[in-house]
């Protein structure tokens, strides 16, 4: 079943390029209930065949302050504009369905980057900032063996909503948030938006394509 909000998101005028392809992720198949929350394209396959939609957007990073998991108050544009490619998702720590799968994908992607992992900035922004304190985010990050290149962020409710709206994530309720991963090669470049569950291998392929890295330059293990 495709909701009205899903249809609206799929037909957003900001899309410059889009494609739909089958996801190969076993967790996605096992978590059928989670896929219901993903932003699906208007034309979809049956629910038993999860889909991944890849599009390109020009997002404006909002000038908001967030609190990093180390307790430091930071400006989001500065965090994203440190020269590294950015891989971004939105989670909350008490989520028991979608978020653990998304974070596990990040964890495996981080491993597959190998020696190049410190060249990428992985970012997870909480959509439940009232509950997700920096201490809780640190505990959550440890569960997924997040390295120093993968940071988690909280802040005020207003700042979290501004970030969600800026990147087309906001769905009105944290329990129905979309399964979206966003990638950007460098400041000022367009964002690659991946809607739906993607395997760590597929995410690595998208990353390589985005930054123009030769296949052998990123460890795959």
Predicted regions and their residues:
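Short active-site neighborhood of thiol/selenol oxidoreductases, capturing the structured segment around
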Residues: 79-99, 106
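Conserved helix-turn-beta segment immediately C-terminal to the redox Cys motif
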Residues: 103-124
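Thiol-/selenol-based redox modules, centered on thioredoxin-like
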Residues: 177-221
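Short, internal strand/loop/helix patches
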Residues: 139-178
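A short beta-strand-turn-helix
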Residues: 65-85
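N-proximal helix/coil linker or "cap" segments that precede and/or mark the start of modular domains
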Residues: 40-63, 81-83
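Thiol-based oxidoreductase modules, predominantly thioredoxin-like and allied folds used
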Residues: 119-132, 149-158
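N-terminal secretory signal peptides that target proteins for export/translocation
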Residues: 1-20
């Amino acid at each position: 079943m495709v909701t009205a909000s899903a249809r609206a998101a799929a037909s957003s005028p900001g899309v410059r390029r889009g494609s739909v392809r089958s996801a190969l992720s076993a967790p996605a198949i096992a978590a059928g209930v989670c896929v219901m929350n993903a932003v699906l394209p208007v034309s979809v396959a049956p629910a038993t065949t999860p889909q991944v939609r890849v599009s390109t957007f020009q997002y404006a990073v909002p000038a908001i302050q967030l609190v990093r998991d180390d307790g430091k108050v930071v400006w989001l544009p500065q965090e994203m504009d440190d020269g590294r490619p950015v891989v971004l998702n939105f989670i909350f720590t008490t989520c028991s369905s979608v978020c653990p799968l998304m974070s596990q994908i990040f964890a495996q992607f981080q491993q597959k980057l190998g020696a190049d992992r410190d060249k990428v900035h992985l970012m997870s922004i909480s959509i439940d900032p009232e509950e997700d304190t920096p201490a809780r985010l640190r505990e959550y990050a440890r569960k997924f063996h997040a390295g120093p290149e993968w940071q988690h962020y909280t802040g005020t409710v207003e700042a979290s909503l501004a970030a969600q709206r800026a990147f087309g994530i906001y769905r009105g309720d944290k329990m129905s948030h979309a399964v979206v991963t966003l990638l950007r090669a460098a400041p000022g470049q367009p964002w690659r938006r991946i809607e739906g569950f993607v395997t760590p291998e597929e995410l690595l392929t998208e990353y390589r394509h985005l930054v123009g890295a030769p296949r052998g330059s990123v460890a795959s293990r």
